[in-house]
C-alpha cells in the first residue's frame, strides 16, 4: 500500500472518529438519566462526504499543484502549497483565527457541549504538562495524577480553611505541585526506564491513599465540598452573592442564567491552556528545552556535552508538575468537590495515553488526542465497551502509526539523489 493511500485512509478515518461523536451523537435527558441518540441520515451523509473529501485531498494533494500549474501555463512546485502553509505569517493568522473561534464558540453552543469542551481543556493542560516529562525529556511517569491531586487539594484546603479565592490559590497550587515534583525528583531521578516508572506509579498511589486516610484534614473518602467557583473581577456567577460581593447578573442588570457560569469556566480553562502552550513553546526554544531533547535522545551524550542529567530531569519534573497543579486547581473549582477517588491510576493512564496517542512532544497532537479520548469517555451508551474500544485503538495506533496522530516535527536533513 502506497504512502499516499495510507495517509488518505488514516485521514478519512480520523474525520469520521472526530466528527461522528460531535455532530452525530446527541444527549437527551430522561428523568435523571442521559440517553445517547444516534445521528440522522443527513448528518451521516455530511460526515461521509467530509471523509470522502479528505480522502481524495490526501490521496492527490501532491499532484494537484502540478496539474493546476500546467493548466494555467506556468510551472508550480509540488511543495508550493506546503511551503505556503509553513510560512510564519500564514501560521500566525491561522492560529489567531482558531483562537477567535474558540472564544466565540461557547456563546452559540449548547451548555452540554461547552461543559464537555471545558473537560477537554483540562485534559489538554494535563497532557501538555506530562508531555514535558514523557515527550520532551523521555521520562516515563506513571504517577502524574499525584501532582494533579496536589493542585486540586491545595485549592480545596485553602478555600476551606483560609477562605482563599480561585485566582489567589491558582499560583499557590501550581507552586505546591512543583514543590512535590522537586521533592520527588531528588530520590528517584537517578533511576531509568522501568524502575523510574514503578517509583512514580507508587508516588501517585501514596498521594491518593494519604488523602483518603487523613480524614481530619482532607475529609477522607468524602473529600472537600463547597469549593468556590472563579469570579470575574470580584463578580460571582451564583444566584445570590456571598456577603461583601455582587453577582454578575445584578451588576449588569440582566436575568440570571446558569449558562454564564459554564461559559466563564470554559473561558478560564481556554486562557490557562493558551498560557500553557505559550510557555511551553518558549521553553522549547530556550536552552532548557534543548537540554530536555538531548536527554531524551541519549543520556550519555547529554552528560558528555557538559549537562547534568539529574538537574535536567529535575527541571522537567518540576515544570511538568506545576501544570498539573494548575489543572488540578481548576478541576476543583469546576467540580466544587474533590475526593481521593478522582485521582486513581486510570487518570494517569488516560493522560499518558493522550500524550502517546497524539504524538510524544507534539502540542497539536496532545490537543487532538484529548478531544478523541474525552469524547470516547463521554459516550455513555458504549460505557461497557469503552475500555475495549480504548485498548483496540491503542493497539491499532501502535501497529499502524506508532509515532502518534500528529508527531512532533523535528529538524532533519534529507539526502536525495
Swiss-Prot record:
Keywords: Amino-acid transport, Cell inner membrane, Cell membrane, Membrane, Transmembrane, Transmembrane helix, Transport. It is a multi-pass membrane protein. It is found in: Cell inner membrane. GO terms for cellular component: plasma membrane. It comes from the Bacteria. CDD domains: TM_PBP1_LivM_like. Disulfide bonds: none annotated. Component of the high affinity leucine, isoleucine, valine, transport system (LIV-I), which is operative without Na(+) and is specific for alanine and threonine, in addition to branched-chain amino acids. Belongs to the binding-protein-dependent transport system permease family. LivHM subfamily. This is High-affinity branched-chain amino acid transport system permease protein BraE. It comes from Pseudomonas aeruginosa (strain ATCC 15692 / DSM 22644 / CIP 104116 / JCM 14847 / LMG 12228 / 1C / PRS 101 / PAO1). The gene is braE.
